[in-house]
Every structure is written in structure tokens, then in C-alpha cells.
Amino acid sequence: MTLRFYDTATAEVRDFAPLVEGKASLYYCGATVQSEPHIGHLRSALVFDQLTRWLQFRGFQTTVVRNVTDIDDKILAKAAEAGEEWWARAYKYEQQFNAAYDKLGITRPDYEPRATGNISEMHSLIQDLIDRGHAYPAPDGSGDVYFDVRSWGKYGSLTHQNIDDMQAAADADPRGKKDARDFALWKGRKPEEPTTASWPSPWGAGRPGWHLECSAMVGKYLGDAFDIHGGGLDLRFPHHENEMAQSQAAGRPFANFWMHNGLVAYQGEKMSKSIGNVIGPGELFAQASPRVVRYYLGQAHYRSVLDYSPESLEEAAAALARIDGFLVNAGANVQRVEVEDSGHMYLPPAAKQGFGWFAYAPLSDTPAAFVEAMDDDLNVPKALAVLHETVRAGNSAIASSDLVELQKKFEAVLAMLDVLGLSSIATDQAADNGSTHALETLVQTRLQERQQARTEKNWARSDEIRDELAEAGIKIEDSSNGATWSIERKQQR
């Protein structure tokens, strides 16, 4: 099946044809580091991590850029309110964002430029727009420079709006505009703002406008044209509309695809700081492991609204428990499979490293139905259905002692988990190789002792060992191929 994505600009699902064969260039909007991250930021980053992983799986060499907006009206206002330096506040929250991303196993981008590190590129873009008649310095001497929206006939094409129906640009204290919808490319310094938050320019000391920052950084790292621009649905207008307008007005084709992820709701209600229902990473990770959180954030179609509730994390944990239970039982059985062609025992790489085989994922074993789902506008819900159906089939293979079929299902599940980024994070059962290897050694010793008791028909001793392990949270399951074990998951409240 051809790889296809929904393009916001054309409002249709289109075949993905990269600008350069075999390569895919992506830019997605990172954080404005004014305060701590929340669940919406995490979902957006995760969606584009899934996209990047899938493009790589399909053989594309990816170049990913995610910006950091480290200078902005809100950053200045909140820093002043808190009595701290704006740059210190920005850096502090940038680190918090990265820590949350890392915890979720979100791959770092190839480039992560800060707005403050690309001022000269912004000056060049502004001057180009002025020279082309699409921007103008404010006539009041304020140092502001604005984009002239009526000079660009395609303004509104991304969000399919008529210019006269649009809201006024929400620039703080706008000065000297021709049209209320004109937006700031450069903001002249105001007397109450710190001198450290301004840079010299041909139009006077000041700082860049938010929309301009992204266009300049895209041009620097990906060139005038690139494959995919991504971000949250709330960024379509005005941010992405303005990005596209100013870039194309400067003669840059810009993005070939625009992809937007849906927002996160709280039990059906829009999340809002004023309501007090915004969920941060600290609260999420207190309720569930990073792997469970990743499963939850990534399980819905990326364009749909994701609804949050404590129960949704419990459901995600239960879904992963079913997968992990299969892997534990299958791992013990798969090691017994003799590979017919080679005549030696099949053993997954690192299988002797406790749960090391969670990281084993031969991509060639990914089921065709899974590939078709992911190719179809990154349909993760459908792909997860394939994953869970494979788990069910694998459990049936265990029950029927069909070890050859079990091996196939085992490899397929590992492959799908790897693609979804669910095998790259330490599992709840395996925080690190050292501790899990020790745990497995201890449990296996007890199981051997139990098996000896069963051989001697000492059923009381066998049950006693089983009960002792159960008390420690170890669940034992007996089958014709021997006993297997897993950690009994407790519901997190």
C-alpha cells in the first residue's frame, strides 16, 4: 500500500511523495518554554515521534527539526511576574520538556534550534519580505515590522478562510498597523522590557515575532522546501497560517504536507488552566509508568481528540499487561523451538539477559495488516488491533503447543512494539537488566524446587512455593511445556 497522510492544506488524504527520493524532512513546532509541560505537549511530541519511526521503518532517511521558542511575550511576562530572568526561566522549562520527552522514549530530533540562536536568519527573511512588498516597518517609529496580509492573495489558504472573516492579530500592544490582521515580524523594544530581551536590527532594537521564528529556522535547517510540517491543531491559525504566508511570500515553497494532531480533553471537557484540569507529566507518571503513558497517549488516531481520565491509564496498563503476559510466556516457550533449516535451537538475541528480548524486533516480521494500517494516515488504533489479535493468536499457539507458530507470533509482536516505541522504554517488569536478571534467577530457582516437589508428588510443598511466589506478586501458570511466571500487576489509583 502507498504511504498516505491527511494534508490540512488540501483537506484530503494524499499519497506521500518525498521531495528527495528516499529521504523525508520534517519540522514540527516545539514548546514555547514559558511554564511546565502538560499532557497536550506530550501527545503532540509523541504523535510526531510515531510518524518519524514509521517513516524510518518504511526506509526513509529522516531529518527532523523541532524548535524551541525561548523568547516570547508570555515568557517575558511570566518571568517578570516571578521576578526571574527571562532566559533563566526559558532554560529551566526547556529542560523540563526534554526530561518528559526522554522519559516517554521520544527520540531527540536531529536539530533543536532555539529562536534566540537564529536572529540573523530572521533579519534576512524580514528584509526579503520588505523588498518584495509584503512587509513594512511601522510608520510611528516604534521599531515594529509587520507582514501585510492583504499583499498576499493566498493568505488564509491553509485554514480555508476569507481574510475579511479572520480575527485581528493578537500582537501585544500593536502599533502602526495598516490592517488589524497584519502580524508582527519584528517587535520594537518597549521601555519596560529588559535590554537582554532585544537585539539590534535595521529597524531598531527589538525581538522577533513568534511566527517569523519558525519560518527562519525551517529555512536554515531544511531549506526553502521540505516534506512535512507538524504541530497541534490549535496552531493551525494563526501560527501556521502566518508561517506559510510569510515563507511563500518570500519565494519559499515551504511545506509539502501539513499534519496536525488533535487536542486532549479531560473527561470530555476542554483542558484549561483557568478551569484547573490541566495534567502535567508529574501527575501522569505518578499514576502510571512511562511505557503505560506512552501507550495511552499514542493509542487514538492522531487527528482525533484524546480524552483523559484516570481510568484511561488503567485501561492502557491492562492492555500492556496482556501483551507482556504473552511475551513472558512465549519467551519461555520460544527458546525451545528448533530451527529446522539450521538444526540448532532458536534463541532470541539477549534472551539470557532477563527480559532483554523485549528489545528484539525483526522488522521483516511485521504483519502486512499492521503495515497497511500505519500506511493509511498513521492509523495506530487499527495497528494496535492487529497487535492484540496477534497476541490472542499467540496465546492460542501456547495452549495448543504449536511452538513453530508461536515463534512467528512472538517475533511479530516484538516487531510491532518496536515500531510503536513500546519496547524502547524499560517495562514495568524490567527496570534494568541487572535487577531483572537477578529476579529471574531467583524465581527460576524456586520453580525448579517446585517442579522437584511435583515430581515427588509432594503437592503440599508445590502449593506452598506457588503461594509464596504469589504473595510476592509472582503469578505462576502451568502448561504442558512447564511453568511460566509473570509479575501480577496492581491497579494504580
Swiss-Prot record:
Residues involved in Zn(2+) binding: C29, C214, H239, E243
Co-factor binding details: Binds 1 zinc ion per subunit.
Protein's cellular compartments: Cytoplasm
EC number(s) recorded for this UniProt protein: 6.1.1.16
GO biological process: cysteinyl-tRNA aminoacylation
UniProt-listed InterPro entries: Cys-tRNA-ligase (IPR015803), Cys-tRNA-synt_Ia_DALR (IPR015273), Cys-tRNA/MSH_ligase (IPR024909), CysS_C (IPR056411), Rossmann-like_a/b/a_fold (IPR014729), tRNA-synt_1_cat_dom (IPR032678), tRNAsynth_Ia_anticodon-bd (IPR009080)
Gene3D superfamilies: Cysteine-tRNA ligase, C-terminal anti-codon recognition domain, HUPs
Binding site for ATP: K273
One Pfam family linked to the record: DALR_2
Protein family: Belongs to the class-I aminoacyl-tRNA synthetase family.
Name this protein carries in UniProt: Cysteine--tRNA ligase
